[in-house]
C-alpha cells in the first residue's frame, strides 16, 4: 500500500464528530416522542428505531470533542440516547430496575470505547465535568429522574440548559419539597452527596438553585429528609 493510500485509509477510519445529520435525526426523535418529559417508547420503537440506532452508531465512532462544554453535551446526549435504546431493547419494562445489569452490565460504544451507563456517568462524565448540575441532565428512564428535554444539548447552550434543568428539578415535587425549617430532597442528593461537597455542600447547592423565598424559608439549619425514589418507567 502506498503512503498516500495508507494516509487515506487512516483518515477514513479515524473517529469523527457526530455528523449534523445524525444530530438532527436525534433532535427530531426528541421533539416527536418526548412530551412533558415522558417518552412514547412504543411509538419510537415502532416507527423510528432506525433513526435512534443511526445516532448511536454515530456516537460509537465519534471522537470526543476537545472543548469542555461540547464534550459534556456529547456525554449527556449519549447517555440519554442509550437509555432510550436500552429501555426499548428490554421490552419497555415497568421499571429499569427490573432489568438486571441495565446500568452496570449492558454495554454500548461511545467514542470508540465500550462502556456501561454507570461507567459513562461515573468514570467519564463526572470526573471530567466536576459539575453536579449534570445529575439533573442525565435521565435514567424513571419517573423519579429529572425529566428528558425535547432538545439535545450543545456546547453553546450547556450552561443555560444545566441551570434550567437544575432549577426545574428542584422546583418539582420529585426533586425537592421545601418548607419553613425543613426540606425533603431527591435521593440523588443522598447517593451523590460527595459530588456536592457533602451534606453542607448539598444545602448550599439547594439554596443557590431554589427560588429565593423558599431558600430563605429553610433557615440556617433545616431538617433534611429524602424522598422515596420512583423507579417506574417514564413512559407516556
Annotate each language-model stretch with its function.
Residues 16-236:
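Interaction/scaffold regions that mediate signaling and macromolecular assembly across diverse proteins
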Residues 4-12:
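Hydrophobic helical h-region of N-terminal Sec-dependent signal peptides
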Amino acid at each position: 500500500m502506498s503512503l498516500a493510500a495508507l494516509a487515506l485509509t487512516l483518515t477514513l477510519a479515524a473517529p469523527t464528530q457526530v455528523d449534523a445529520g445524525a444530530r438532527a435525526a436525534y433532535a427530531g426523535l426528541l421533539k416527536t416522542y418526548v412530551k412533558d418529559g415522558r417518552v412514547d417508547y412504543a411509538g419510537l420503537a415502532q416507527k423510528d428505531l432506525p433513526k435512534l440506532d443511526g445516532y448511536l452508531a454515530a456516537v460509537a465512532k465519534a471522537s470526543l470533542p476537545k472543548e469542555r462544554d461540547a464534550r459534556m453535551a456529547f456525554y449527556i446526549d449519549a447517555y440519554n440516547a442509550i437509555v432510550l435504546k436500552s429501555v426499548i431493547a428490554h421490552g419497555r419494562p415497568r421499571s429499569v430496575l427490573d432489568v438486571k445489569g441495565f446500568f452496570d452490565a449492558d454495554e454500548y460504544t461511545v467514542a470508540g470505547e465500550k462502556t456501561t451507563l454507570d461507567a459513562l456517568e461515573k468514570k467519564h462524565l463526572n470526573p471530567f465535568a466536576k459539575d453536579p448540575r449534570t445529575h439533573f441532565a442525565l435521565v435514567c428512564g424513571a419517573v423519579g429522574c429529572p425529566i428528558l428535554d425535547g432538545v439535545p444539548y450543545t456546547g453553546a447552550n450547556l450552561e443555560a440548559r444545566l441551570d434550567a434543568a437544575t432549577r426545574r428539578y428542584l422546583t418539582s415535587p420529585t426533586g425537592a419539597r421545601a418548607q419553613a425549617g425543613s426540606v425533603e430532597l431527591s435521593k440523588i442528593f443522598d447517593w451523590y452527596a460527595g459530588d456536592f461537597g457533602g451534606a453542607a455542600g448539598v444545602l448550599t447547592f439547594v439554596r443557590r438553585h431554589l427560588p429565593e423565598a423558599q431558600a430563605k424559608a429553610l433557615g440556617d439549619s433545616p431538617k433534611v429528609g429524602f424522598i422515596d425514589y420512583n423507579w417506574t418507567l417514564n413512559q407516556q
